[in-house]
Amino acid sequence: MKKLALISVFALSASIQAATLDYDSDSFLGEVVKESLTLLPDDYLNSVDDKIIIEQKSFQTDQLFDSEKLCSIDEGVKFGITRKKKITISSKLIELARRIQTNSNCGHGSFRNMLKAVIIHELTHVKDNQEKISINADFQRIVGMKKVQRNSKKRLMNQNSDSSPDAYEFLNLEESLAVNTEYLVLDPEFECRKPATANFLSRKLGIPLKGECQKNFKVIAQSAFLEDNYQLSVSIDPKRIYQIHYLFAGKGQALMSKWGHAMFRLVVCAPFRTVAGPECLNDVSHHLALSYRAYMNDINISYSKGVFGGYPSQLFVLRYLEVQQEYTKFELRDLFSIPLKMTANQKRDFLDLTLERYWTYQGKYYFIDNNCGTETVKHLAMALDDEESRLISSVTPLKIYKDIIKDKNDLTDENIQGLSREQMLEHHYLVESMFSELNDSYQFLRNYMPSFSEKKMKKFLKKTNARARLEDYENFINNSHSMEPKLRKQVAMKLVHLERYLASHFLQDVPKKALQKMNEDKELKEEVMKMGQTLKLLSVQPWEVVNARYGVPTEEEFEIQFPVFISQRKDEIKMSIENQMVNLENILGKSYFAKELNELETLKQIKTLTSEFIYLVNGIK
């Protein structure tokens, strides 16, 4: 028999106006519809004041059910369709849900649960059509839209199906809302696997969190150094984090660095701390940097790919001290660290999104309009109140910095806007580029080294060669025995300081020349590509290190898989470094790298000489 079922039957008050559901309550479908309704809030469809018809029908895609195993269903199979206020569900799915009771380890676990999921999914579409939840700005920021918009049919940038419970969520905003709602209702682990999404949906849909899972706050620190990449697990548990800072690297020389780089710094407390307090600011070795970057595993960087979305945009978790060295030492850029004003709930929301982004997000990097600045603003805006997020209207890292430090915006606990450079240094809001220190060393050494004739260090860096410096150092060491001992020691220290930078600067330039020359030499190209292929083999994603069911791994998944990865990785890294050394020797063996090879050999001699010199003067107090 067919009858009308009032949603208000399930409501606390029958006086609330609500939709009516029209379905065959005596059928198997009707039975599952009623089960599904008990899982939803009583007022779930109160915004809909029309009749909603639920019926079953054969779909053309039913023929893709070539297996009665849930895990073997092909992509593209339609389970349900909503057109205005009419929901149609696949009769084949209903028949399988009625007949097959076995559980599976994929999807929703059984055909019956799959049927419930389809009902919840389609009812969510009806609700969304009325309330427009899928175009909510925070939802778009969480799921990874390029920019907040009014088009709910727009395809998501994030297409990381490896970490998704159902890749159908990436079709558009509407489907993302419906798919994630299915899992929020039916999967007790969802709120721990996709915590930011779960918190948002719970608040907007009125679906309470179950609290039946234990959130795993562990992530794996990434590194530009092969031997350190994915070797250290770290926790971003809010209880262990004192502050979250906006981390801004000043402008660099490269085209893509002209506007600086936007990041975050997590002030993580050392394990021995019992309370997250100001003392944690001293635990610098435990601090982390969150950096949205283009994921590039090509040895040859393509600017056109960077402009047109050819590289994925991902959230990297790096050790703060490595990031500090990257910018202040190697790129000679200032680094600003500004504490953000956040409530405990805002900090939790920020870190939940960090977890979810790290383990699931792979968007598209666009140099102009989806870069480190825009990704950083979206991440921060999701955690802030609407009024606060509107204060950060910029998309470039420098302008974001200026918005954040404005006193009137009240986004920091400190009055930073009017501070002088000296005051910024004193309060540790600024870590200066090493240029000033290096320049001091250079200007000091100009008094003793004839080849240091350029007044400006930048000109010296472009012209200097290791052979001339080696001759200067040898002459100085041989002829300075009568020099005042403390002054001689000072010269030695300055030499080592400058040479460490010059050696690293040289080693960074060699690959650039190899890339420029490789299209002129087939054999060279083969060696360069071998190096690139080796790097690709070792270039893995977080979700490949720990292969979770979906989303953020559980603690059990993490503790089982990560040690196995570490064990396998040791041998791979050793072999990779050996192979790369062979490739590098073959590359430098080319005739047009004779200058570089000679420079490298001379740098080795300088290192030996300066080490001996330091040892010689080391006893001087």
Question: What are the roles of these predicted feature ranges?
Answer:
Residues 1-18:
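Classical Sec-dependent N-terminal signal peptides that target proteins to the secretory pathway
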Residues 19-99:
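Auxiliary, metal-adjacent structural segments of Zn-dependent hydrolase domains
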Residues 21-27, 101-114, 164-168, 250-253, ...:
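Second-shell loop/turn segments in exported
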Residues 62-64, 68-109, 240-332, 366, ...:
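Glycine-rich catalytic cores of cysteine/serine-nucleophile enzymes that process amide/ester linkages
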Residues 98-107, 133-169, 190-228, 353-621:
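Activation targets extended, charge/polar-rich intrinsically disordered C-terminal tails
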Residues 113-133, 178:
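Active-site recognition of the HExxH zinc-binding catalytic motif
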Residues 150-158, 233-243, 256-257, 261, ...:
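Active-site-adjacent bridging/hinge elements
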Residues 199-251, 259-261, 274-275:
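N-terminal regions that are enriched for targeting/export leaders
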